């Protein structure tokens, strides 16, 4: 990173930086994957190019498995807006004589590797303090009744009370499913009724509606309200349930506020947002509140990439000395572990092929069979495996 300038696309001093850019050979611009920020980035790139002729651009998409990678770039009518913008970005910059390379970063790159055959694949190094899948303690669970979940929560609170920790309960149904289903709101309400028995300091629900939180002790509730009022954060309250718009607060800061209110063990209930690339860790520098336990009840047909992404919320480098525990069915755990073993075989084969992915490479590997689809059915990955 010598002679490299790293900034965000929203940096208010960007123009003045460009005017005095003689000392920089490389610019790194960080942005969100949405059409507005992609357009802003294109404008910044052109501004730099006009000042100092750019030789090349590298677009790096994190969570690359969810980025649309259409084969036919001339027909993007039915593609997401961000994808259209990236195609437009690539074409316009190429027309100006700038070389463009695209890199997709993903822990679950199946739809990239199986279908799109990238020209080169890098296996990124894993930090020594990384807590991986092999460090997760599996506890078979088939009874997801309120009584059984309450007992598990009480046990986890006893085990985590000194060290602290966050419990994630990834449920089968979304917030808007039938009221008789075991959906997020029903699970949330059931656990609130048993909050005293669990010993949890706080119960939260995290989804597209925002963040809901209930505290066991009045003292912690008062501290939290005082905290968010001091920060001028908007909230509503209904029957002791505090509601915060997730657009007003990032999840790491929210957990940081809970930690500041002396919350040691916290439960978060959710579904889709837990299955994505979000780190459930507070923003505290020292001993951050970290997801260390997961109770997982996915649907019977949920694909293995989603299983891996959800259970992956327990992995990482935060609080690496704390034990991790997973409560789920034997079917889920076996598919998860088989999926990871298959990944190892694929990466090994690609490495032996000079890090290139040939058309027949995947189909030539003897992969272990799973009882669930590899990825979304619309991708039809299984046909590329046989």
Question: What kind of feature is each model-predicted range?
Answer:
Residues 1-28, 35-58, 71, 75, ...:
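Conserved C-terminal RecA-like helicase domain
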Residues 10, 33-34, 63-65, 107-109, ...:
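Short beta-alpha junction loops
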Residues 55-56, 98-100, 282-292, 319-324:
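Short glycine-/polar-rich loops that comprise or flank the Walker A/P-loop
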Residues 58-60, 101-103, 120-124, 293-295, ...:
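Hydrophobic/aromatic beta-strand patches that form the interior of the parallel beta-sheet core
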Residues 63-70, 80-117:
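Conserved helicase ATPase motor motifs in RecA-like P-loop NTPase domains
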Residues 115-133, 287, 293:
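A short helix-turn-beta junction within AAA+ P-loop NTPase domains corresponding to the substrate/partner-engaging
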Residues 152-156, 160-162, 179-198, 317-386:
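C-terminal helicase lobe and adjacent C-terminal extensions/tails of nucleic-acid helicase motors
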Residues 282, 292-321:
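Conserved SF2 helicase motif VI
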